[in-house]
């Protein structure tokens, strides 16, 4: 046996954020041939290279300093051998040679001790026992793994070289302080399991994690991890995909413990993963009750190894054990059935036993319900908990309120180690309103389908199968958008619909975004038991990007089985755009095709619906909800229509180009689209799948029908229900049959309401006017009353007529106008006076250019419903749809004719309701209001409070009660209370139905004094809930833009804009120059939660940015002055100028502008808002004389260098010569001020500010070249620009290497900056000396060709530029370029033969000493 050698002469140096460490003995004695490298740079060491082992001292209770050189380990049948471990001290870490375990030694203070040895492993034996006794003990212990290692049942443990790991009697000790991630791997693995540990932190820093389903490959990590971060008391759950970490939850708070001990537990059952900390649920894939934010993933890793992870901590893991689960032991629930003795339970949907969510609807009289829970494991204990935290062991007679009632159902078993294993389900028992409420709502359309309760948007999965139309759609049980489900409705005639149970819930792959359903009639997918196939759904799973998952149904959509593999993911798409959604699939030419977008359009193909390949991509054609289908036109030609979300369309051909199926737009559509619907409220159009389209030679094109969602994402969709006071928010447009006509050589789409709507006409009450003469004074419809009707009209105007059309839903000063303007040939819908106006965008007139018929006539076919208007014209080639919310009493109509006269044919049909379960009632069943329930008034202001009783046909008799009548002066007229604020204070006013006193609405009103100091006239809230209290203007909002504008212009071309603001959160906008009171594209100054001030065009591009040198988020008022001249803007904060920008040109309104304020997603207070004439404003004395060394513009390039950080900025010729230096602040990984987008990343962040000789900030006028230094030994993943702390923009960059006169090299990233702010380097998670990353990353060319990767020699920078820190670029001289390899096969340099003879050891020793000396060079400059 060779003599053991213990290394004690360790060195360790900092290089950037990495440690270089090694042992000089290695170089002298030749026990290893590898040179010391940074721990994070080892590219060839895998989990198997480094092993963990238990080593026992002779007497663990003694405090001897004697080191035990060699000990023995036990290995019995069924028990993994325990190999050597590194000691639990941060400064004693060895680097293993190939195929050898890490070895070292430790004092006798621990019961398990590590030795450094190259000998074969010995058995674990008490040092005071005889050899035979050792064998007896070993044999006796063999069957009981826990007796050999009571702290863990992980087998064949190993770890990486970052930090130390040691198994002792009291646990697995690990120290990785300052080392970043330190992994412990094992050969134990599992698919379904419970895996837990008790971790105790020795210090209040670092994070401890369970690693599971791991591939045990530190160079290409694919695994899951859950952790507790002791410093921030946060829990995380994430996954690595090819070394890229993907967060699966938002960080969650963890309640601190007194002893710093936490129990981490993972329960995994196939795709469902749950994570508990101290038995509190932190994560559950698909559980939107726990977390609403989308955090999806690609195909779930089905199984893998167990491990541990220590991040920068010193900790002990105890009871680290896993127990496998199978079909008999997992605490699954097979079904939860809701029943009620008091009311009806609606049809139950499919219960997914391996998903956490389920919804069950019950009738209004079901005020109590019972849960019948079918346990899959009879040994499980089940408890039910309501939202208040009350726990029920007997889930019967559970009280439920009207609306959503979420119950938490926990199923628990005990594993072999005595630990609880729990799966947590949520069941939402949704109790309906009274039956009389439904379909009597004031704004419930009567012949447009809408969701009964909750939210609905995009139609999905439209399919006609076995005589039934299926309409799936996006759904959430709330009145605003949320975690997406697929709801389901069926019909046999496209007008009468039946709600079915919810079809799909969010799952581990993400939330259920839009998709489609096809009929796999020949079982091409192989998913079905028989050749006749069935329905296949292709669904977008959203979260961390987007992907497609499949589900299939063999019972006509009643139940579904999800396919266990993601069939297409954005990460594999050539466009590399995360917007990868809304698939629409069709069958053509004997294969499946899929169009999808969400961003850029793509077309894929497949033979089996499971394996998809890219056919063609369209990076410049962006849309949502694409659809593509063939139509045989009226001339017999087959053409293809590309629908862009139901908003616009193109017509062309679908054919192979270079072997790839491609949509080729006709010439008329190459550079433009046609409008599909000019109204705001028609979106996400989809056609019903009927059958195979056939082939090119034998097409079988069915009649195609589409439907749209009647709303828009552009502005107000989430406002509808709350504003008009209803419990549903989701209506769909009319079903339309599609066609194509050839019009003057261009194919035009026709959209015609399906014939079935004719059956809803009440022909007995219809009005028919044939060839009547109408003019501006006509009274043809003076006696008409209706809220749901159809108008079919044909106008033949005379030569003087300028407009024809209709006033719809007329009354109480309200009307919605549908007008054809003969002079401009424009068809429009004007709802600016239609009643309740949801937003400024809602009030805008929507229109489209439409030519008259060939004979000069105009056709207007209009469908009016309680809350919508749809118009069709020009042989149904033109369509427009808008929502409206008029006063329920506005039921009149009239004909519009202006300028002259017209002959007209007009028919008006009252429309019957489609709601077969609507209850007729003569008494009020609901009270609505379109007035906000919380109001802020100023003394002297007036407000109308109005309520409506439903149905609209009942008497609107209400009484009003006022809590403090002294504060207001009131008058009542019917269901309207007019009030005027007379005194400061707060009061409540309640409206009560006289006929049904159970119906009421209460308004809370705060009355303030307006002492806001300003010289601006007409200051008013354009959007938002701004209010003044005394001298302060307040506003707050969530995820919206609020505007507060002066209705009159200041009247000056040059002015000073002064205001005091107290920042609280969000983004504050100062509209310095706007073209009108809608500040779109206004010249704006923006402040946020950072040191950066931004000058930009509102809703447009950034103009310039500057660093203020401080943040203004200190809850104090800060004075902002913006000086606007004819062509410049100067910004000062608290008297300090922070930005000066000159414009080459400005918009015409820049010097005749409106001003105002804005807020995005935040809260703010303002005081003292004044705009004064700059020409009369006293100006401080200044010395305008230019310095001789500062010409107006640079005659040549100038380089500015910051010696402290090494940042270099190269200014272009022609740049302002007043810029003489750059001011740079720098933060790096784990800094307390780390921006949110850089959390958990390895980065360097530089805030760069150009400065003039007076230390004033100067904005650059031309793009500048920037060089940022790279930490030695690290690989740059990306270069980012941070416009604010919650957003990053990736920049293209190249790598250069500079060499100074002393021969020292430094690598930099080089990129172009349009303006200066915060720029950062983000390093790869696994940094290595040699590149092992992808050759190409987003916006980055990593191939480093000769012309990009340059080595440059410079003279001694610090001496040459110490005075003014500037230099001409010409002083930097280039030498021969060097090339950095980016080959994925790059490895560490060859360290020689392991059998190197002793004649080489002297050379190795010299190299070792040399490395010790130069290690310090790689330290950061600031260190």
From Swiss-Prot:
Family matches, as Pfam families: Big_2, Cadherin-like, Glyco_hydro_32C, Glyco_hydro_32N, Laminin_G_2
GO cellular component, one term: cytoplasm
Propeptide: 1392-1423
Single biological process term from Gene Ontology: sucrose catabolic process
Keywords: Cell wall, Glycosidase, Hydrolase, Peptidoglycan-anchor, Secreted, Signal
Compartments, as annotated in UniProt: Secreted, Cell wall
UniProt GO molecular function: fructan beta-fructosidase activity; sucrose alpha-glucosidase activity
Disordered: region residues: 44-161, 1368-1394
Residues spanning the signal sequence: 1-39
EC class (word): hydrolase
Record's catalysed reaction(s): Hydrolysis of terminal, non-reducing (2->1)- and (2->6)-linked beta-D-fructofuranose residues in fructans
Residues reported in the UniProt entry to bind substrate: 455-458, 474, 513-514, 581-582, 783
InterPro entries from the UniProt entry: Big_2, Cadherin-like_b_sandwich, ConA-like_dom_sf, Glyco_hydro_32, Glyco_hydro_32_AS, Glyco_hydro_32_C, Glyco_hydro_32_N, Glyco_hydro_beta-prop_sf
Bias type Polar residues, positions: 69-126, 1368-1385
Inducers of expression: By sucrose, fructan substrates and fructose.
Domain spans labelled BIG2: 924-1002
Region (Involved in binding of sugars with beta-(2,6) linkages or binding of molecular weight fructans) residue spans: 867-871
Pentaglycyl murein peptidoglycan amidated threonine PTM positions: 1391
Membrane topology: Peptidoglycan-anchor
Catalytic residues, chain numbering: 458
EC number of the protein: 3.2.1.80
Chain location of the short sequence motif LPXTG sorting signal per the record: 1388-1392
UniProt cross-references to NCBIfam families, sorted A to Z: KxYKxGKxW (TIGR03715)
Functional summary from the UniProt entry: This protein is a fructanase enzyme which degrades levans and inulins to fructose and also cleaves sucrose into glucose and fructose and can therefore function as an extracellular invertase.
Family: Belongs to the glycosyl hydrolase 32 family.
The protein's name: Fructan beta-fructosidase
Gene name of the encoded protein: fruA
């Amino acid at each position: 046996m060779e003599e053991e050698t213990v290394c004690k002469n360790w060195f360790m140096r900092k290089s950037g954020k990495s440690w270089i460490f090694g042992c000089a003995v290695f170089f002298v004695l030749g026990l290893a041939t590898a040179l010391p490298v940074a721990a994070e740079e080892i590219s060839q060491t895998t989990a198997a290279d480094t092993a963990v082992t238990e080593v026992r001292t002779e007497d663990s209770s003694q405090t001897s300093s004697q080191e035990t050189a060699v000990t023995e380990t036990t290995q019995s049948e069924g028990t993994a051998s325990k190999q050597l471990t590194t000691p639990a001290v941060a400064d004693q870490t060895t680097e293993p040679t190939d195929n050898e375990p890490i070895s070292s030694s430790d004092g006798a203070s621990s019961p398990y001790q590590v030795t450094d040895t190259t000998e074969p492993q010995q058995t674990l034996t008490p040092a005071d026992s005889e050899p035979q006794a050792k064998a007896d003990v070993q044999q006796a212990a063999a069957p009981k793994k826990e007796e050999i290692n009571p702290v863990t049942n992980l087998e064949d443990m190993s770890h990486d070289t970052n930090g130390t790991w040691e198994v002792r009697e009291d646990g697995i000790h690990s120290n990785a302080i300052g080392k970043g991630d330190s992994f412990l791997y094992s050969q134990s693995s599992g698919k379904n399991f419970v895996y837990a540990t008790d971790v105790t932190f020795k210090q209040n820093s670092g994070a401890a994690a369970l690693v599971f389903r791991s591939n045990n490959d530190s160079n290409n990590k694919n695994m899951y991890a859950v952790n507790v971060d002791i410093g921030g008391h946060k829990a995380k759950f994430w996954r690595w995909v090819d070394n890229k970490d993907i967060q699966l939850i938002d960080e969650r708070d963890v309640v601190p413990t007194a002893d710093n001990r936490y129990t981490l537990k993972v329960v995994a059952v196939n795709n469902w993963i749950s994570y508990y900390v101290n038995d509190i649920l932190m994560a559950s894939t698909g559980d939107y009750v726990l977390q609403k934010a989308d955090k999806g993933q690609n195909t779930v890793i089905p199984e893998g190894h167990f491990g541990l992870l220590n991040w920068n901590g010193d900790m002990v893991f105890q009871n680290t054990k896993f127990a496998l689960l199978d079909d008999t032991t997992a605490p699954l629930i097979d079904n939860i059935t809701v029943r009620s003795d008091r009311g009806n339970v609606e049809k139950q949907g499919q219960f997914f036993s391996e998903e956490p969510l389920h919804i069950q609807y019950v009738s209004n009289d079901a005020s109590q319900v019972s849960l019948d829970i079918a346990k899959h494991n009879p040994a499980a204990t089940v408890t039910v908990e309501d939202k208040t935290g009350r726990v029920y062991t007997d889930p019967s007679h559970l009280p439920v309120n009207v609306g959503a009632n979420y119950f938490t159902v926990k199923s628990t078993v005990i594993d072999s180690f005595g630990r609880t294993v729990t799966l947590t389900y949520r069941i939402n028992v949704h109790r309906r309103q009274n039956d009389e409420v439904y379909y009597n709502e004031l704004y419930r359309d009567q012949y447009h389908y809408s969701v009964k309760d909750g939210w609905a948007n995009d139609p999905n999965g439209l399919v006609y199968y076995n005589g039934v139309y299926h309409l799936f759609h996006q759904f959430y049980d709330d009145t605003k958008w949320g975690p997406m489900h697929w709801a389901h409705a069926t019909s046999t005639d496209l007008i009468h619909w039946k709600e079915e149970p919810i079809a799909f819930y969010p799952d581990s792959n993400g939330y259920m975004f839009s998709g489609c359903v096809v009929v796999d009639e020949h079982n091409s997918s192989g998913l079905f038991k028989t050749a006749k196939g069935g329905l296949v759904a292709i669904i977008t799973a959203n979260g961390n990007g987007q992907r497609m998952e499949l589900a299939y149904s063999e019972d006509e959509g009643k139940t579904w089985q999800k396919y266990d593999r993601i069939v297409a993911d954005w990460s594999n798409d050539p466009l590399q755009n995360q917007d990868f959604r809304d698939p629409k699939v069709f069958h053509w030419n004997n294969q499946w095709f899929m169009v999808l977008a969400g961003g850029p359009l793509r077309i894929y193909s497949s033979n089996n619906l499971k394996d998809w390949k890219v056919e063609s991509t369209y990076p410049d054609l962006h849309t949502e909800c694409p659809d593509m289908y063939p139509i045989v036109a009226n001339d017999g030609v087959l053409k293809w229509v590309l629908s862009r979300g139901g908003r616009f369309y193109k017509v062309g051909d679908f054919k192979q180009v270079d072997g790839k199926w491609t949509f080729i737009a006709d010439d008329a559509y190459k550079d433009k689209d046609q409008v599909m619907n000019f109204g705001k409220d028609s979106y996400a159009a989809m056609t019903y799948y009927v059958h195979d389209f056939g082939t090119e030679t034998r097409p079988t094109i069915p009649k195609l029908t589409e439907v749209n969602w009647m709303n828009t994402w552009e502005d107000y969709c989430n406002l509808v229900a709350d504003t008009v006071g209803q419990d549903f928010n989701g209506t769909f447009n009319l079903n339309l049959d599609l066609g194509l006509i050839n019009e003057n050589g261009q194919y035009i789409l026709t959209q015609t309401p399906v014939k079935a709507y004719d059956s809803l006409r009440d022909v007995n009450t219809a009005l028919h006017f044939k060839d009547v003469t109408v003019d501006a004074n006509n009274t043809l419809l003076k006696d008409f009353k209706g809220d749901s009707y159809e108008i079919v009209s044909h106008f033949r105007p005379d030569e003087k007529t300028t407009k024809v059309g209709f006033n719809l839903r007329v009354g109480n000063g309200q009307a919605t106008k549908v007008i054809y303007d003969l002079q401009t040939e424009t068809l429009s819908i004007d709802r600016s006076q239609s009643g309740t106006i949801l937003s400024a965008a809602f009030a805008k007139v929507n229109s489209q250019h439409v030519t008259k018929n060939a004979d000069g006539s105009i056709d207007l076919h209009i469908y009016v419903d309680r809350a919508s208007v749809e118009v069709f014209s020009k042989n149904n080639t033109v369509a427009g749809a808008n929502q409206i919310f008029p006063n329920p009493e506005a039921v009149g109509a009239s004909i519009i004719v202006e300028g002259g006269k017209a002959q007209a044919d007009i028919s008006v049909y009252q429309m019957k309701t489609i709601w077969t379960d609507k209850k007729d009632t003569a008494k009020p069943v609901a009270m609505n209001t379109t007035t906000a329930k919380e109001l802020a008034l100023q003394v002297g202001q007036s407000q109308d409070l109005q309520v409506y009783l439903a149905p609209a046909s009942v008497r609107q008799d209400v009484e009003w009660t006022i809590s403090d009548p002294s504060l207001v002066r009131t008058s009542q007229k019917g269901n309207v209370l007019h009030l005027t604020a007379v005194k400061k204070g707060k009061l409540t006013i309640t409206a009560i139905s006289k006929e049904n006193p159970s119906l009421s609405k209460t308004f809370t009103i705060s009355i303030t004094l307006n002492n806001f100091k300003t010289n601006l006239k007409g200051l008013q809230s354009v959007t938002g809930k701004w209010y003044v209290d005394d001298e302060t203007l307040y506003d707050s909002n969530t995820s919206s833009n609020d505007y507060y504008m002066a209705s009159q212009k200041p009247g000056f071309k040059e002015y000073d804009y002064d205001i005091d603001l107290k920042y609280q959160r969000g983004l504050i906008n100062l509209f310095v120059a706007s073209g009108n009171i809608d500040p779109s594209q206004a010249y704006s100054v923006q402040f946020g939660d950072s040191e950066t001030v931004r000058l930009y065009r509102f809703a447009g591009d950034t103009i310039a940015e500057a660093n203020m040198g401080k943040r203004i988020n200190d809850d104090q008022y800060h004075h902002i002055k913006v000086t606007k001249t004819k062509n410049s803007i100067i910004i000062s904060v608290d008297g300090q100028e922070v930005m000066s920008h000159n414009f080459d040109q400005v918009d015409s309104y820049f010097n005749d502008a409106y001003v105002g304020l804005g807020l995005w997603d935040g809260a703010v207070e303002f005081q003292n808002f004044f705009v004064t004439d700059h020409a009369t404003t006293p100006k401080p004395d200044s010395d305008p004389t230019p310095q001789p060394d500062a010409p107006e513009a640079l005659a040549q390039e100038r380089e500015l260098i910051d010696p402290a950080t090494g940042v270099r900025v190269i200014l272009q010729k022609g740049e302002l010569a007043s810029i003489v230096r750059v001011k740079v602040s720098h933060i790096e990984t784990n800094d307390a001020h780390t921006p949110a987008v850089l959390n958990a990343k390895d980065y360097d962040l530089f805030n760069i500010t150009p400065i003039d000789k007076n230390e004033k900030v100067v904005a650059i006028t031309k793009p500048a070249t920037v060089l940022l230094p790279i930490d030695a030994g690290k690989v740059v993943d990306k270069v980012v620009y941070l416009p604010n702390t919650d957003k990053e923009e990736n920049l293209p960059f190249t790598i250069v290497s500079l060499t100074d006169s002393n021969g020292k090299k430094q690598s930099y990233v080089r990129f172009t900056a349009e303006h200066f702010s915060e720029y950062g380097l983000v390093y790869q998670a696994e940094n290595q000396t040699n590149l092992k990353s992808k050759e190409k990353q987003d916006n980055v060319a990593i191939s480093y060709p000769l012309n990009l990767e340059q080595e440059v020699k410079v003279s001694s920078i610090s001496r040459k530029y110490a005075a003014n820190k500037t230099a001409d670029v010409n002083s930097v001289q280039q030498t021969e370029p060097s090339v950095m390899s980016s080959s994925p096969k790059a490895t560490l340099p060859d360290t020689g033969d392991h059998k190197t003879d002793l004649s080489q050891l002297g050379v190795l020793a010299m190299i070792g000493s040399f490395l010790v000396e130069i290690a310090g060079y790689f330290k950061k400059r600031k260190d």
